[in-house]
């Protein structure tokens, strides 16, 4: 057994006090009786009625019958409540000479724990006859012995007790002797042969008599022994013991061959008649096996180990015989002194190896302790370690119940090894330890817990259907089916979110899949809740939030808002030949449906009728003159402007412009705007859109005024000059202008028709109108703006 460390003294004292207190409780036991040798299965009692219990309560409360010696001689029929004999009982085997013969038992019930004490009295029947240890007894008597002299004879043994035991002795009829039956202090009956008349060896040297031992049964049983009496010549004095009886105490752990006591007998005769030898007289087998006596010295020696718990004292009859055959009798009373040589015993009557974790006051084990020593050596204390959630509860007659002190938590500890220590109070102290293992069975008291309270997943748009986009994970601290987690999608809080068509979840492992291709331009982000449920009863669950962010892909090419590229009559921009370098011809307005850097647009003059005459502002799409115009320059010019985004790979679109150089216009100088600071490129998309629309508005308004003036004042030239036809057309409503900042000095007018649902709009553009009454200032010095060339892209 493994030994524990120091036992907490407070718990020891408490357990001992409770034990002593309960040992004083006198609960009246229920008593029954049965004759020995009654057949097994015989009815003893009806416990349900005797204990005042309801029908079926013995079965529902798991009633059991426990006995002190751990031998199951009784059995309980829980259904009928009958107490039955499990086996045939032999009173002599169970109790020997002890009377009355009582078997103690306990009836144990659970829920709640309850004990009832019981006693079964085994009544003796006359099933044994008296038996003498020998078949013949030789008795030597001097012929001069006087009438009335007593001669001890062999005693008979009868295993029965009471009236069925040995009652008297008789001897066969004769004229010289009769039998006197004497009662000994131990309760035994001794036969003494009493001489009735003088003897004469010469007349009758020998007698052969039959000694009969009778018990008190009905009918009586008997045993016989032959008594042979030899009449001897005179030996005047028989040996006499100096002390009788002798009394001695011997420790039960005395070694073998230890001297117990030396007896002494004296014979006042001389010669051979005065020589004394010693021996055991009518000794039982137990005494012969335990002790021996030296024939010469009279010293009694120990031949076998003593055991106080089995035999507490011995009465040894001794005999001293002289050379003439006369003998004297003596008695040695040997008291066995108890020593603490028996460790306490722990007998488990009931053990529950598995208990639920949420059940306080659950009985784990019922056990009994005992110590076969006596006095202080037999007093015991019982304890368990202090750091365990269990307590010991004494009940009765050294019975204990081990119960849970509070609800257990399997997730903290799934198994307990409990060491029960029983220590006696002897010197030195002896102890016994026994370990029991208790498994804590799981109860579904823990809900699944997600590794994160929220998850953020990133999915690039235009994904393939059934794409694995991420996983959620939850664990359950329980075990078995209580820890098996099932995942599910919970109903979205937004009733308009088609969650069932967007994502799915694997119920077993929490993997999330996109059910269809996602479009960033239609849905940038959405969120939903996932649930994790265990398979306990009842099931417990938890939930987590999942956010899905759709990443933009460069799947939209730039779209040119102005000028429209719809295949109808081209739009012609009018430029006076007197225009100075940096003169704003028009502005290409484009948007990109993507976001971020995928929507950053840049402009480039791809083709031109006359390279070097016009340039395009790279960030805002403004088309300006690059130098002074001359009469040699062609009147009509065709420009192709490339609009490209910043995606990977980049996407692009082209815008075709028609420019007509005209005479007679004034030369309004449009100063080239300062280069936008580097940080303006990082302005938000909303700012770009507002600036672009404002610029277009100004340009269109100015074009309308100029166009009306030209039509009214120079109607004759209208046919040769041409007109800008800008038919109405649909535009996606979600497009935005992310071009660079900048405004037009001319006035433009535009009309935008947008609907939130259709996603389309109508744009109407009008040409800017310049008054033709302005006179060109030919004498004004034209100075080139150095910033202009650095900001334009020339073809």
Swiss-Prot record:
Sugar attachment sites: 183, 417, 566
UniProt keywords, alphabetically: Calcium, Cell adhesion, Cell membrane, Glycoprotein, Membrane, Repeat, Signal, Transmembrane, Transmembrane helix
Record-linked InterPro entries: Cadherin-like_dom, Cadherin-like_sf, Cadherin_C, Cadherin_CS, Cadherin_N, Protocadherin/Cadherin-CA
Segments on the Cytoplasmic face: 711-795
Entry's Gene Ontology BP terms: cell adhesion; homophilic cell adhesion via plasma membrane adhesion molecules; nervous system development
UniProt keyword Acetylation present: no
Cellular compartments per GO CC: plasma membrane
TM ranges: 690-710
Domain of life: Eukaryota
Membrane topology: Single-pass type I membrane protein
Protein name (Swiss-Prot/TrEMBL): Protocadherin beta-4
Organism: Pan troglodytes
Lineage, opening ranks: Eukaryota, Metazoa, Chordata, Craniata, Vertebrata
